[in-house]
Design a protein with these regions (language model features):
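Flexible "cap/lid" loop of the alpha/beta hydrolase fold
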Residues: 1-15
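Acidic beta-to-alpha connecting loop that harbors the catalytic carboxylate
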Residues: 87-90, 115-117
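Active-site phosphate/pyrophosphate- and oxyanion-stabilizing loops and adjacent acidic/basic residues
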Residues: 71-72, 99-100, 126
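Conserved alpha/beta-hydrolase catalytic His-Asp/Glu region
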Residues: 11-75
Length: 139
């Protein structure tokens, strides 16, 4: 992804991290589509509360780790690997991450969660858990 995206995140965190968290979690869960259906307002608020309680310094310092280039490392993975991601991920689009990751890891199994946002472990837990259990049975 373009490095300017991460610079923008850092600027937003410095300017008003609480406002940043509010916007971030809207896209983390795709609340415009899934709020009240697959995620509750309380679950979103609980995540916001955890983020708001985190160190401002740590929140800012973790952003550069999000764009570390691990592509060379992925080509050396030699264990069974499941890559699972939502096709509606607004935080890290599947074309920029999951699809590429699955191609770089030899023999990786790709599972795409239809209409899944970034936090598929919450919004699509049954499907994610089913995929994980099936993968582990075969691994």
């Amino acid at each position: 992804m373009d490095g300017s995206v991460f610079e923008g995140i850092q600027k937003a965190l410095v300017a008003d991290r609480y406002a940043f968290f509010t916007e971030f979690f809207k896209n983390f869960y795709n609340t415009d589509l899934l709020l009240g259906k697959r995620v509750s307002e309380q679950a979103v608020q609980a995540n916001w509360n955890i983020s708001a309680g985190a160190s401002a310094t740590a929140c800012l310092a973790c952003v550069p780790t999000w764009h570390e280039d691990f592509r060379n490392d992925l080509t050396r993975v030699d264990v069974p690997t499941l890559v699972i991601q939502g096709d509606a991920d607004r935080i890290l689009p599947i074309t920029a991450s999951g699809l590429r990751t699955a191609k770089l890891i030899k023999g990786a199994r790709l599972s795409v969660v239809k209409d899944g946002p970034h936090c598929i472990t919450w919004t699509h837990a049954e499907q994610v858990n089913g995929e994980l259990l099936e993968f582990l049975r075969k691994a």
